[in-house]
Amino acid sequence: MKKVLALVLLIILALCLVCCGKDKEGICISVDGEKSTGGALTGEISLKKLSGEYTLYFGDANGEALQGYTKIGEINENTPYKMEKLVIPPDAKTIVAATGEGGTYFAKIPEEYLLNKENAFIFGALSDIHFNKYNKVAEDDAVVAFNNALDYYEKIGADMVGVAGDLSNDGELSAYTKYNEAISGRSFPVYTVTGNHDYNAYKDKSWQENISVGIKGCEFAPNGLDFAFYPNGPDGDVFAFLNITFYSYSYFEKTRPVVSINEQIPWLEGILKAHTDDQVYVFFHLFMCGPDGQSHTGVGNLMNPGGYTYPLPFQKGNSDERRIRRFFKEYKNVVFLSGHSHWAFEMERYNEETNFSNFNGEYCYMVHIPSVTEPRWIEDEDTERTGKNGELSQGWTIYDYGDTVVLVPVDFLSGTVYTEYMEIIHK
């Protein structure tokens, strides 16, 4: 009987714990083995033979806090830190506890929960560059912001960068010239779609002549505008770039589709049907309303206590929107990436779905991309938004490991990586 009891206790211990830090014997990571997965931890972090207040960070193999990463949280001898699907960034090997007095302790993250970055397809997700629109800190703030972001992706070894539209102020040719200059000579391809500010350029064919012509290694749709990128060949994962082909601010035209029902919708549906067992990333400019039909509950939007919300979603109930919404309910292997509202990552405080959600499994995962040039900010009682160009410049670095996707939010200006907004998808 004693042997059976001992065996049971060993099994429970293997499932529910452990990795107590032997380095400096400072902290202990207790892992719930049933709820933790590759790339994310559930359980708790506690102090071991220590007292006082400590701040937790992700660290490297030597127990040094990863540079630029925001804190995980706080801990003291009476209150362990509860991990609820704590996403592990690609470079993390340890969790570090530090005090203001200089005391630092760390514990190793169990290796079975670490993902091998060498096996990942790494891509950046940017939006709303807006050349020629903002000049707070430079002759053209977008030139500085976009080039800085691309330099960041060069440094981390990105394989591709996708942009969710609005390259220009109003479809002007000079914006596309600046865009092409910025992406020229990069070690990775940069692909984009049209935004509402770019629509004029599409209408007069300037887009195809200046942007589409530079897209190589992709399969174009019959309209010569939309295209698919296959990083591992046509039988694997796919990136679909879906463009706005009409846009109007007029109340009388708000029910007119921005995506062609007869051309673009069948093209997108064909890709989705052909890749039900693969990851499908869809880049599109406009964000969707929430499941309740409200703009402010969708991924990509919010409403602050003062009542402000960004007023221009992908119009709920339009014929194109209904079809695409149905796709996103049916094909849960899709990751939908959009921009348009510019909201900074921090604005998630007004809507927990602002940055990322699948609405409890009702839809595919949706991702909001802030503006790389002018992330927007709003306080509780503000009735207008504030542009943070020159102060913030944000986007995502996304690691596709094959069966897991880790999304890492970045501010390119400061080099900050937002630990609290990291997300994970298990395919």
Task: List the model feature ranges, each with a label.
Residues 125-127, 160-166, 190-196, 282-284, ...:
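Active-site neighborhood of phospho(di)ester-bond hydrolases with catalytic His/Asp-centered motifs
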Residues 138, 252-259, 275-338:
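Active-site-proximal segments of metal-dependent phosphoesterases and phosphodiesterases across multiple
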Residues 18-19:
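C-terminal motif of bacterial Sec signal peptides marking the signal peptidase cleavage site
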Residues 23-49, 105-114:
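Pro/Thr/Ser/Gly-rich low-complexity, intrinsically disordered linker/stalk tracts
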Residues 173-275, 279, 323, 329-330, ...:
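Extended active-site neighborhood of metal-dependent phosphoesterases/phosphodiesterases
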Residues 86-103:
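Beta-strand-rich modules
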Residues 58-91:
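Recognizes extended acidic, P/S/T-rich segments that occur
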Residues 114-176:
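N-terminal active-site segment of His-dependent metallophosphoesterases
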